Swiss-Prot record:
Subunit structure: Part of the 30S ribosomal subunit. Forms a tight complex with proteins S10 and S14.
Family label: Belongs to the universal ribosomal protein uS3 family.
Name this protein carries in UniProt: Small ribosomal subunit protein uS3
Top-level division of the source organism's lineage: Bacteria
GO molecular function: mRNA binding; rRNA binding; structural constituent of ribosome
UniProt lineage: Bacteria, Pseudomonadati, Pseudomonadota, Alphaproteobacteria, Hyphomicrobiales
GO biological process annotation, one example: translation
Gene3D superfamilies per UniProt: 3.30.300.20, Ribosomal protein S3, C-terminal domain
Region (Disordered): 214-241
Length: 241
């Protein structure tokens, strides 16, 4: 079961939380859901070069709060904040409500599954050898503190006549363990030979407390910690186990 299901959906309510955080009655639920989908697609398409990891949407009373997690926040903000004001206005027009926009920097894009998948897809589109792109991503993630990573690429790799799937794994990726903090991301590379699909799983350690916000809080705290501090935490968890 853990091998097939989306690892993020599998852990929702345990150590992961939803990217859309709001409640609505039956009459307006569908409309708000489609607004979320439109906003996410718009942000992902409009800010493709900014390295968007995820878009979190919250809806306090008759307002909308959008948090964009980006590896390159400077591209979103623009010169003297001009670009972010334009983006805020466009999102407000989509929701017909007051929209607040927050930008959160992803300090280590090498261990963010969505950004790793996007990076590999961009390399495949530039005709970089898929094995080299995958190995480079694996080495970077392990060097920056990931406890395990698995990458699969599927399609007409290298222009082959018959599509196939290749994968690399290093370290542990325990998909069945619910307390494991596993990040998952996908991307598509539009090559001259057709579309190649990329999937990335990154194991960042175990979360022992039962807290849906634990993974998000840990990511923010991890940006402030150095590698030595993370190693001490990992050793402490192993001793307790």
């Amino acid at each position: 079961m853990g091998q097939k299901i989306n690892p993020i959906g599998f852990r929702l309510g345990i150590n992961r939380t939803w990217d859309s955080r709001w409640f609505a009655d039956n009459a307006e639920y569908g409309q708000l859901l489609h607004e979320d989908l439109k906003m996410r697609k718009f942000v992902m398409d409009e800010l493709k070069q900014a390295g968007i990891s995820k878009v979190v949407i919250e809806r306090p009373h008759k307002k909308c709060r959008v948090t964009i997690h980006s590896a390159r926040p400077g591209l979103i903000i623009g010169k003297k904040g001009a670009d972010i004001d334009k983006l805020r206005k466009k999102l407000s027009d989509m929701t017909n409500s007051e929209t607040h926009l927050n930008i959160v920097e992803v300090r280590k894009p090498e261990i963010d599954a969505v950004l790793v998948a996007q990076s590999i897809a961009q390399q495949l589109e530039r005709r970089v050898a898929f094995r080299r792109a995958m190995k480079r991503a694996v080495q970077s993630a392990m060097r920056l503190g990931a406890e395990g990573i698995k990458i699969t690429c599927g399609g007409r790799l290298g222009g082959a006549e018959i599509a196939r799937t290749e994968w690399y794994r290093e370290g542990r990726v325990p998909l069945h363990t619910l307390r494991a903090d596993i990040d998952y991301g996908t991307a598509e590379a539009e090559t001259a030979f057709g579309i190649c699909g990329i999937k990335v799983w990154i194991f960042k350690g175990e979360i022992l407390e039962h807290d849906p916000m634990a993974s998000e809080r840990r990511a923010l705290e991890g940006d402030a910690q150095g590698p030595a501090s993370r190693d001490r935490d990992r050793d402490r968890r192993r001793d307790n186990a």
